[in-house]
């Protein structure tokens, strides 16, 4: 029988991805860690604040190894959702940490790093991409270089005909990311009644 896992999630932006995943998984992370300053609460998804603020831990914008350890300790898995810091090697090796990436780096390693959606969009006129996707990979000190554990993809015949803007393409990849995360997390975490997300 699968036991309950303790799940912590980190973000630096709005936390909206965590909220969307949680409502579909049926529970929130046990702890939600952000390096967003308290004065920027208005930039965090209001529904996430309303439903799960008691799970929040605020860390400095540039945490030390000790600050990471204190926030992450006593957990089974850690997921990153728009967390804009490269984690120290000691933290990567100490915990099971997973990150999502909106580029099919298993097929196109050039999409590693920042803004892969824009890379695909702006290069498409010269080098058309017909396979697109989202991956979840283990976090190691090198950016987007950890083992890929889950991926979802879709095909296009013509990117510019099927999407009328970069924003619409990003939205499609975002929806795919939510699907990928939900399946990934459900396969690892059982859902105790006290943690249901509504």
Predicted regions, residues:
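One-carbon transfer enzymes
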Residues: 1-198
């Amino acid at each position: 029988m699968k036991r309950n896992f303790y799940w912590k999630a980190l973000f630096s932006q709005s936390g909206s991805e965590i909220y969307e995943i949680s409502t579909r998984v049926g529970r929130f992370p046990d702890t939600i860690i952000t390096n967003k300053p308290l004065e920027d609460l208005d930039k965090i998804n209001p529904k996430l604040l309303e439903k799960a603020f008691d799970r929040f831990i605020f860390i400095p914008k540039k945490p030390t190894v000790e600050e990471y350890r204190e926030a992450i300790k006593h957990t089974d898995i850690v997921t990153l959702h728009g967390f804009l810091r490269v984690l120290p090697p000691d933290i990567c090796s100490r915990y099971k940490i997973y990150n999502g990436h909106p580029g099919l780096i298993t097929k196109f390693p050039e999409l590693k790093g920042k803004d892969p959606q824009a890379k695909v969009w702006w290069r498409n006129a010269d080098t058309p991409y017909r396979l697109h996707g989202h991956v979840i990979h283990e976090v190691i000190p090198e950016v987007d270089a950890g083992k890929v554990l889950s991926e979802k993809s879709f095909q296009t015949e013509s990117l510019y005909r099927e999407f009328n803007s970069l924003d619409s393409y990003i939205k499609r990849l975002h929806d795919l990311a939510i699907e990928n995360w939900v399946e990934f997390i459900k396969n690892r975490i059982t859902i105790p009644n006290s943690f249901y997300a509504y």
